[in-house]
Amino acid sequence: VQHPPKIQVYSRHPAZBGKPBFLBCYVSGFHPXZIZIBLLKB
């Protein structure tokens, strides 16, 4: 049975209007060990 990877995306700091922030993305539960991940703005 194959399961999709687990993906978690969250900001490093609480959001503030007009201020930039960084997003952290953690992906686990996939094989092979090296994959390419693209973040797209929706």
UniProtKB/Swiss-Prot annotation:
Main localization category: secreted
Sequence ranges assigned to domain Ig-like C1-type in this UniProt record: 5-42
GO BP of this protein: antigen processing and presentation of peptide antigen via MHC class I
Keywords from the UniProt entry: Immunity, Immunoglobulin domain, MHC I, Secreted
One GO CC term, this protein: MHC class I protein complex
Keyword match Secreted: yes
Cellular compartments annotated: Secreted
Domain of life: Eukaryota
Subunit architecture: Heterodimer of an alpha chain and a beta chain. Beta-2-microglobulin is the beta-chain of major histocompatibility complex class I molecules.
Function: Component of the class I major histocompatibility complex (MHC). Involved in the presentation of peptide antigens to the immune system.
The name this protein goes by in its record: Beta-2-microglobulin
Species of the source: Canis lupus familiaris
